[in-house]
């Protein structure tokens, strides 16, 4: 499940980019995904990829164990080493 928030199931949004001359081309707005360790329903620690907005709610409800900002989250299926 690359580029998907694993809690809210949100995906990237698509649309058009418009210039001043009203030219258009297709583009996508990707999510701000962060890899984080959280507690699940059984109080086990699970590593998930969530958006920054979801992470804000998790921090508010004290569900976050650890956020690893030192390494970017792996994006599978895109420019992966062979």
Swiss-Prot record:
Q: Which InterPro entries does this chain map to?
A: Bacterial_rp_bL28 (IPR050096), Ribosomal_bL28 (IPR026569), Ribosomal_bL28/bL31-like_sf (IPR034704), Ribosomal_bL28_bact-type (IPR001383), Ribosomal_bL28_sf (IPR037147)
SS bonds (residue pairs): none
Q: Name one Pfam family in it.
A: Ribosomal_L28
The alphabetized list of GO BP terms reads: translation
- Keywords linked to the UniProt accession: Ribonucleoprotein, Ribosomal protein
Region (Disordered) residue ranges read 1-25
Q: Which GO terms describe its cellular component?
A: ribonucleoprotein complex; ribosome
Q: Which GO terms describe its molecular function?
A: structural constituent of ribosome
Q: NCBIfam families under this entry? A: L28 (TIGR00009)
Family to which the UniProt record says this protein belongs: Belongs to the bacterial ribosomal protein bL28 family.
Q: What is this protein called?
A: Large ribosomal subunit protein bL28
């Amino acid at each position: 499940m690359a580029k998907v928030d694993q809690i809210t199931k949100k995906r990237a949004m698509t649309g058009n980019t418009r210039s001043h001359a009203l030219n258009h081309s297709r583009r996508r707005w990707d999510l701000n995904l962060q890899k984080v360790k959280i507690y699940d329903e059984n109080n086990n620690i699970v590593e998930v990829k969530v958006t920054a907005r979801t992470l804000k709610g998790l921090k508010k409800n004290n569900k976050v164990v650890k956020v690893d900002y030192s390494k970017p989250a792996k994006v599978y299926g895109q420019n992966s080493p062979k």
